[in-house]
């Protein structure tokens, strides 16, 4: 068995989760068993994995494991049909599609919040005291059973959370205590697990125990995808290899080793080796550690398509991926401004998500300052066929990321025959893109000139599109799987 491990599957997944999921699917398609393993509690986990192209048999979540809920057939729980709400005693009112109120003799005793992206299905139920304070909250699993109950102090902070099997048996409790003035989880208690109770101080300790239990049943190779979980690994007694896949550069912009990797690189965490996306990074990292550093792609493209100018929105630039300060999205705005000096109707679309409201406000201000208000748009985060349509509707992909591990968004665009203009950074574009499409970091004019050339010369665009599609062949499933098998992982 191959265990590809990270924190969660999110509503807005990053390249790490997409890479992990694509590799899971790839391995299984070659009858090489693999699981997408996650640590975090997520009642909608079995819905979000679908956006990653996975099914219930390809995933393993820690909480599912202890809740005896790894394979549960979904039964939709409509709040008006749920047997947990006695209709003879309570009245249900629905002031809006996202919430219903449970009333007893005219007083609201509970609020039922509909599960996001569903119609009237149980999401969570908040129980209220006579002062409208939340005293408890039930979380419902996407598959239709009550998964946990959290109990609250009068100040709104959680005191205790209980987790259930689909049959309603309590199997896990998390106690929250005051630590330096803040209520925090301080004890994870497994109840009657294999006939005994177990206590852990942290979620990571519980995860280590979980993996050891899983490995007793199905020994295998571990590949960890997230540095935030490095300290879960030393206690895992894997009978085979333990590897860390680094999806980014190992250094910051000043060339200094990331502090999160210091113990790993010293060999203090019990890993068998480190895997990176490019041979260039492999060569740079190997002198820094006694661990073997291996190289295999973190990107897999489903199929190659030859794009057509007829499909593109003329002079449209696309920026794809998470919108974050370290990705320098403001550079794309300056480049657009330079492009418009020669191609007045050029437009720019950001496609991705951001959790940084301050950054978005700063970008809005810069858009106004540069006079780009009518030519820049921010599109919704999309996946699958909708993402394909977005890529095929652009004429150029622009990447202003100053540091890369691979550059998944570039490779995905290239597989659709979309030309890419990117900063010439290590461990990404300069390993699979021609020099004429690479520009120095921060050189707005040179990037703009390359884009203008593609916009104004159809023959040049078609040739760039052909080369992009051709180069993306390096990342097809068959090619990538062979490179992974050549690693000879333990």
Model-inferred region functions:
Residues 308-327, 336:
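Conserved donor-binding/catalytic core segment of Leloir-type glycosyltransferases
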Residues 347-361:
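Glycosyltransferase donor-sugar binding loop
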Residues 360-381:
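Nucleotide-activated donor-binding/catalytic signature segment of Leloir-type glycosyltransferases, i.e.
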Residues 402:
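Aromatic "clamp/platform" in nucleotide-sugar-dependent glycosyltransferases that forms part
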Residues 419-422:
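Short hydrophobic beta-strand element within catalytic cores of glycosyltransferases
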Residues 434-445, 452-459:
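Conserved acidic donor-binding segment of nucleotide-sugar-dependent glycosyltransferases
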Residues 460-474:
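A short, well-ordered alpha-helix in the C-terminal region of glycosyltransferases
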Residues 474-490:
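C-terminal alpha-helical cap of glycosyltransferases
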């Amino acid at each position: 068995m191959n265990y590809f491990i990270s924190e969660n599957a999110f509503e807005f997944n990053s390249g790490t989760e997409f890479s992990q999921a694509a590799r899971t699917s790839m391995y299984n398609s070659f009858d090489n068993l693999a699981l997408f393993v996650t640590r975090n509690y997520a009642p909608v986990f079995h819905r979000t994995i679908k956006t990653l192209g996975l099914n219930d048999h390809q995933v393993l979540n820690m909480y599912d494991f202890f809740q005896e809920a790894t394979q549960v057939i979904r039964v939709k729980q409509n709040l008006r049909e749920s047997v947990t709400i006695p209709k003879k005693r309570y009245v249900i009112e629905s002031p809006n599609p996202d919430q219903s109120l449970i009333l007893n003799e005219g007083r609201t005793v509970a609020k039922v919040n509909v599960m996001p992206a569903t119609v009237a299905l149980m999401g969570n139920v908040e129980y209220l005291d006579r002062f409208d304070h939340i005293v408890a909250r039930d979380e419902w699993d996407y598959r239709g059973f009550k998964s946990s109950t959290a109990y609250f102090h009068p100040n709104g902070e959680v005191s205790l959370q209980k987790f259930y099997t689909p049959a309603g048996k309590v199997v896990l409790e998390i106690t929250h205590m005051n630590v330096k003035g803040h209520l925090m989880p301080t004890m994870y208690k497994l109840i009657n697990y294999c006939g005994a109770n177990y206590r852990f101080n942290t979620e990571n300790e519980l995860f280590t125990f979980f993996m050891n239990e899983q490995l007793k049943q199905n020994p295998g190779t571990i590949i960890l995808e997230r540095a935030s979980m490095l300290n879960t690994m030393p206690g895992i007694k894997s009978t085979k290899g333990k590897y860390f896949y680094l999806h980014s550069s190992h250094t910051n912009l000043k060339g200094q080793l990331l502090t999160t990797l210091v113990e790993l690189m010293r060999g203090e965490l019990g890993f068998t080796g480190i895997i990176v996306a490019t041979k260039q990074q492999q060569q740079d990292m190997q002198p820094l550690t006694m661990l073997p550093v291996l190289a295999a792609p973190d990107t897999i493209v489903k199929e190659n398509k030859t794009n057509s100018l007829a499909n593109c929105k003329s002079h449209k630039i696309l920026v794809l991926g998470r919108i974050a300060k370290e990705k320098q999205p403001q550079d794309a705005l300056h480049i657009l401004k330079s492009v418009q000096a020669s191609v007045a109707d050029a437009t720019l679309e950001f496609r991705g998500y951001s959790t940084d409201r301050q950054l978005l406000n700063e970008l809005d201000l810069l858009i106004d300052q540069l006079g780009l208000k009518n030519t820049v748009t921010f599109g919704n985060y999309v996946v699958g066929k909708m993402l394909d349509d977005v890529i095929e509707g652009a004429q150029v992909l622009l990447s202003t990321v100053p540091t890369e591990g691979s550059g998944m968004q570039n490779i995905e665009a290239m597989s659709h025959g979309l030309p890419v203009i990117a900063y010439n950074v290590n461990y990404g574009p300069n390993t699979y893109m021609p020099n004429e499409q690479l520009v120095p970091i921060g050189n707005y004019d040179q990037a703009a000139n390359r884009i203008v050339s593609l916009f104004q010369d159809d023959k040049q665009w078609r040739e760039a599109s052909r080369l992009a599609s051709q180069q993306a062949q390096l990342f097809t499933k068959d090619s990538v799987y062979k490179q992974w098998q050549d690693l000879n992982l333990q």
